[in-house]
Amino acid sequence: MDNTLKHLAIIMDGNGRWAKLKNKARAYGHKKGVKTLKDITIWCANHKLECLTLYAFSTENWKRPKSEVDFLMKMLKKYLKDERSTYLNNNIRFRAIGDLEGFSKELRDTILQLENDTRHFKDFTQVLALNYGSKNELSRAFKSLLESPPSHINLLESLENEISNRLDTHDLPEVDLLLRTGGEMRLSNFLLWQSSYAELFFTPILWPDFTPKDLENIISDFYKRVRKFGELKC
């Protein structure tokens, strides 16, 4: 199998702790985190990656205080509108994954509009995981499979493909490298199916402090690793 880094996935963790260290409100950390998101996205677009998936809002994030959730929704809508030119000028295709029905119609329309405006770009895709959780995604895939089962008899042999084709990421490559900032060492229900053979990297750097140079160093480490994909390699 190909060892080239095509799909990078990032759990952007540490905005709140970063703001606390600065004696600022959590919203301040989220705003700085958006700038990091933009910088990392443009770097990836310019360095021949095929796909960057960013964990922006999880199905569990609704449990946060309503004031913070409301702020995040407003910030997301503003980002998608304000950065439209960034996507167009850098030939970036935008995709959203997750249970978008959980959002307001206005926000869903904003998401769909940017997807539509950038759908013709082929070289690089930025994916925002929004109201996303792997358990939710797999549940929706299984529900789809039960509601419209394939007609062929040999289901067990093709079950993996049937599930993959019903995931939000059906048109994207498998994850090669999954990175989490902020020091925590868990996957937090993120791309569990798609990361079955991904290399994992955990850095203590808080997301607002994370730079393209930090990413370069991590990618350099990625290419030093031997990816076996279950095979024996000497």
From Swiss-Prot:
Its EC number is 2.5.1.-. One of its GO terms (biological process) is polyprenol biosynthetic process. Mg(2+) binds at residues 13, 199. The active site is at 13, 61 (proton acceptor). SUPFAM superfamilies: Undecaprenyl diphosphate synthase. Keywords: Magnesium, Metal-binding, Transferase. Its cofactor is Mg(2+). Substrate binds at residues 14-18, 26, 30, 58-60, 62, 64, 180, 186-188. It is an enzyme of class 2 (transferase). GO terms for molecular function: ditrans,polycis-undecaprenyl-diphosphate synthase [(2E,6E)-farnesyl-diphosphate specific] activity; magnesium ion binding. Signal peptide: none annotated. Binds 2 magnesium ions per subunit. One of its GO terms (cellular component) is cytosol. Belongs to the UPP synthase family. Catalyzes the condensation of isopentenyl diphosphate (IPP) with allylic pyrophosphates generating different type of terpenoids. Homodimer. This is Isoprenyl transferase. The gene is uppS.
